[in-house]
Each structure stands twice: as C-alpha cells, then as structure tokens.
Amino acid sequence: MGRCSLLLLLLLIAFLTPGAANPVSPSLRAPSSLPWSTSFRSRPTITLKYSIRYIQQKVDHFGFNIDRTFKQRYLIADNYWKEDGGSILFYTGNEGDIIWFCNNTGFMWDIAEEMKAMLVFAEHRYYGESLPFGADSFSDSRHLNFLTTEQALADFAKLIRYLKRTIPGARNQHVIALGGSYGGMLAAWFRMKYPHLVVGALASSAPIWQFNDLVPCDIFMKIVTTDFSQSGPNCSESIRRSWDAINRLAKKGTGLRWLSEALHLCTPLTKSQDVQRLKDWISETWVNVAMVDYPYESNFLQPLPAWPVKVVCQYFKYSNVPDTVMVQNIFQALNVYYNYSGQAKCLNVSETATSSLGVLGWSYQACTEMVMPTCSDGVDDMFEPHSWNMKEYSDDCFKQWGVRPRPSWIPTMYGGKNISSHTNIIFSNGELDPWSGGGVTKDITDTLLAIVIPNGAHHLDLRASNALDPVSVQLTRSLEVKYMKQWISDFYVRLRKMN
C-alpha cells in the first residue's frame, strides 16, 4: 500500500469512529451563568444494565431484487424511562462492537434519569455481531457492497420505527440521536435525512467537513502538532527531528538490528520497507495520544495516564541529542501508550488501538465513501512531508478491494457546508482533538450550534463525568442537556397542537 494512503488508513482505523484556534463561545467563559445539570455531580461508578436484542434488517433497503436479511444487534436500557414525558436517546453506532461504544458513552447513562430516557445503542452493520453475510461479510467487494452510510442510517430508521411500534408507551415519544466521531457524523446525517424520526442530534467530534477540499488536508496534523507544542518545551521539534534520526540509524550496517533492540520490537526490522512501516506506526501513535488526551487515567484505545501528551513530552525535552539517545527517548515515549500497564514484553508495530474497532469494514468504507484526505509538510507540523495523492490512494483501494473511491459522494449526499436548511443539531468539538479541523466549530444558524471545548479531547463530552473533568466540558454537557430539553419541549408543544 502506498505511503500517503497507508497513513490515512491507519488514522481512519483509529478514528472512531476536531479547530484548535477557534474562539471560545462567550457562554463557555462564564460557567456560572448557566444552571449546572445535577446529572454531572460526583457519583459512584454506574453499573451498566442493559438488554441485548436483535432486529431483522434488510441487507439492501434501496433495491427490490434482494430479500436477504440479517440480525442487527442493539442494546436497550429502560431503568429510568418514563412513558409520561420521557424520551429515547438513540446512539448511532460507530465502526466497532456496540458494547464497547456503550461502555465508553457514559454521558448518556449520566443523564438518563434526568431525561427520563430509554437508552438505545444500535450497532452499525458489518461491525460487531451485525454481519449481513456472516463469516463471508468481508470476503470481497460484492459482499461489502451494502456497507454504506445510507444503508446504516436506514437500519437506524427502521429500528426506531420498530421500537415505537412494539414498546408500549413509546409510540409518541421523541427521539434524540447521539454519536461521537464517525458515530457523531451519522447522528448529524440522521437528523438531516430523517428529521421526522429524530427531533435533534448531538454530534460530538464529528468531522463532517473532512472531505473533498472542504478543509485543508494538513489541518489534522497541524492540530496534533499544536497539542504537543503546548504540552512541553521542544516536544514537537524533537519529534520533527526524530524521523531523520531513525533514517540515519537505519542506513548503518547494523542499524536495523539496533533499532529493533532499542525499541524492543516484537518483530525485528529486516528491510528498508520495514523502516517506513515503523515510522507510520510511530506517527499514528502520536496521533492517537493527541486524540485521547483526557484529564484522567483512561482505557479507551489503550490504558493511559492522565494528560498523556504531557507525559509523552517529558521524554522529548531536548531536541539536540545524539540519534541513539533520540531513539531511546522515542522508546520511553512509546511505552506511555503501549505499556502504561507495565505488562508488555515487546512493542508490536501491528497494534495501535483496541481490537473492538472493525479494521476490515472501515478500510472498505475509507476506500468508497469515507475518503478524508490528510497531508503534512514537516514545517508547520511535526511529521515527515507527505502530500495527498488521490490517484495513489485510489489504486491502493482497487488493489485491496477492487473498488474505486468516490471522494465527492459524501458532500453530495449530505450537503457539504451547505446545511443551513437543517435544524436542531449540536456540533461539539474539543480544542485538543485533531478531528476538530474537519468539524463544525462555529454556529451556522440559531439551531445548528457549535460548541468548542477548551482542554477537550476526542468526544470527551460523551464520556462519563469525572471529578477531574475541566470546567469547560462540565459546562458543555449542561448546555447539551439544556438544548435537548428545549427540543423535547418543542416536540410536545407540536404534538399537543396536532391532537
């Protein structure tokens, strides 16, 4: 696989599933001006209790020649649900096992009682247990042909109609879509395409504009670099210089063996191509650390300390060091991400994130609809220079899957930046999150709202409340609940008028 497309693909796999320089909303500067939601006070860890259920879905919602169906998995929790004045909070599943996303979306559980909400977590087709063709689902592009955002949204639509029809008391209840990362994109698009089924959507860390020249391709890597620059003196500069240090050592007679031993690699480097793979892996590691730069210990992609970027930067205080020292510093920094638990005996360049993410499914989506360009120049960012090469990317996709990407289809389907006719969507983005560069970070209308979260990483607002949360994310969650309650109020006003 080509260099630029491999890096993009690795980034997208870590996605899941965004502008650091944007001004902070005045409301975020005055947290005392908004009543705090009682849902976010310090509380003991909640035990998640849900039922696992399945619904038969059509493999193809839009054609009439295929009658095949499959079982879509979904989770449902109704502990706090009330028929009178209640709500349905519907999580639009990402590119992975839905139980994993359920366990990492504590915000919904935190507000369930206050919102009198039934919680529904819908698994995305081709991920987790929701496989349209079972073991053959990833065998070729013919079986993968039904892995599209449109088909996934149709699954969600049918599931909502089914729940309202079969659960007593749910028929006239409003539904709010929620999601983070790719799931956040789906939540926003779901509100756009099915406004009669959901009264609003919370799209957290949803880079809906990371497509087809809607934003510069280098914005992602620039934000990663800013995170590291702000987290330690000389940190980003040291990383920028580290690539040449690796290259110089690799060219020496015993360089590959020395690098393998110094970095404690599980699989030794044996050829020059392995060096590029090593650097790709290291690059993705720094990206992932920036994404999950949470203010407390976490275990989202990997077990990590609080503020992991700052911890990593402790090993990059000095940029003018011998190459061997630089590589030893790289090893110590990599250990923060891959061996915080202290149990790893070696570092595996094939490992970057949790196995709960669906690698095969996402690589196909990245080769069809979800074409999200990234590039770097090595000057305004800390990575090696790599341009975006659409032809190379397309050729790699064709070689792997036998398909050609359609980079303009998502903007065509969902409107690109021309979305002002839609309503009731909250776009929340953390300033630390690289994906914020492709997200909506300024209000579009009075009902298409943007919240930029200072000191916030990838969909931090969707995570469970924590005593170490910055005030900015506490306020963000209260704002989100405030807007959702307004949508509910407006919904019941319209319902009474109809009756």
UniProtKB/Swiss-Prot annotation:
Glycans are attached at residues 103, 234, 339, 348, 418. Pfam families: Peptidase_S28. It comes from the Eukaryota. Residues 1-21 form the signal peptide. It is found in: Lysosome. Keywords: Carboxypeptidase, Disulfide bond, Glycoprotein, Hydrolase, Lysosome, Protease, Signal, Zymogen. Gene3D superfamilies: alpha/beta hydrolase, Serine carboxypeptidase S28, SKS domain. InterPro entries: AB_hydrolase_fold, Peptidase_S28, Ser_carbopepase_S28_SKS. GO terms for cellular component: lysosome. Residues 196-337 are annotated as: SKS domain. GO terms for biological process: angiogenesis involved in wound healing; negative regulation of systemic arterial blood pressure; proteolysis; regulation of blood vessel endothelial cell migration. Disulfide bonds join 217-375, 235-313, 266-346, 367-397. Residues 22-47 form a propeptide. It catalyses: Cleavage of a -Pro-|-Xaa bond to release a C-terminal amino acid. SUPFAM superfamilies: alpha/beta-Hydrolases. Homodimer. Cleaves C-terminal amino acids linked to proline in peptides such as angiotensin II, III and des-Arg9-bradykinin. This cleavage occurs at acidic pH, but enzymatic activity is retained with some substrates at neutral pH. Belongs to the peptidase S28 family. This is Lysosomal Pro-X carboxypeptidase. It comes from Bos taurus (Bovine).
